[in-house]
């Protein structure tokens, strides 16, 4: 399981160190794609296969399902760690997530998210005010 928040920087070549705690579970190869809330989602290969299976079951006759699947898969790329535990983030994904130098790598149960530090701080400020209300809504999901 992925959890925690780690602050890192992207170097001039677009490389990012993946936190040591995440490396073993991610494996040598994994998939990065456009996530929600303008962050990047990172899935281990098994997690990606499970997500792919779920998305394949969506009805292709629905325009919203087609649009989501198209967007999700078009941004996906298979990545590999180098010997220093870094990945090269493709320019299109850095642009999508508005990543510059400072980023936050967040563990979210079955996936890792990569956020621009400023966007993450803004998201946390917005969400912290709603945390209790969100917790109350989780009752509907039997949590």
UniProtKB/Swiss-Prot annotation:
UniProt KW keywords: Cytoplasm, DNA-binding, Repeat, Transcription, Transcription regulation
Keyword Repeat tagged: yes
Subcellular location: Cytoplasm, Nucleoid
Gene Ontology terms describing biological process: negative regulation of DNA-templated transcription initiation
Annotated Pfam families: MraZ (PF02381)
One Gene Ontology MF term: DNA-binding transcription factor activity
Residue intervals of the SpoVT-AbrB domain: 5-47, 76-119
GO cellular component: cytoplasm; nucleoid
PROSITE patterns found in the cross-reference section: SPOVT_ABRB
Chief localization: cytoplasm
PANTHER family, per the entry: TRANSCRIPTIONAL REGULATOR MRAZ
UniProt xrefs under HAMAP family: MraZ
Similarity remark: Belongs to the MraZ family.
Subunit and interaction comment: Forms oligomers.
Name of the protein described by the UniProt record: Transcriptional regulator MraZ
Organism: Moorella thermoacetica (strain ATCC 39073 / JCM 9320)
């Amino acid at each position: 399981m992925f959890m925690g928040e780690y602050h890192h920087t992207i170097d001039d070549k677009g490389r990012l160190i993946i936190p040591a705690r995440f490396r073993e579970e991610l494996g040598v190869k994994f998939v990065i794609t456009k996530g929600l809330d303008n962050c990047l989602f990172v899935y281990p290969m098994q997690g990606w296969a499970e997500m792919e299976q779920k998305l394949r079951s969506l009805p292709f006759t629905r325009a919203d399902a087609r649009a989501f699947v198209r967007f999700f898969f078009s941004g996906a790329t298979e990545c590999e760690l180098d010997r220093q535990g870094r990945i090269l983030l493709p320019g299109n994904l850095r642009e999508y997530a508005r990543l510059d130098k400072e980023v936050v790598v967040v563990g979210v149960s079955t996936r890792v998210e990569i956020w621009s530090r400023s966007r993450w701080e803004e998201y946390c400020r917005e969400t912290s005010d709603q945390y209790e209300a969100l917790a109350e809504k989780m009752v509907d999901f039997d949590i």
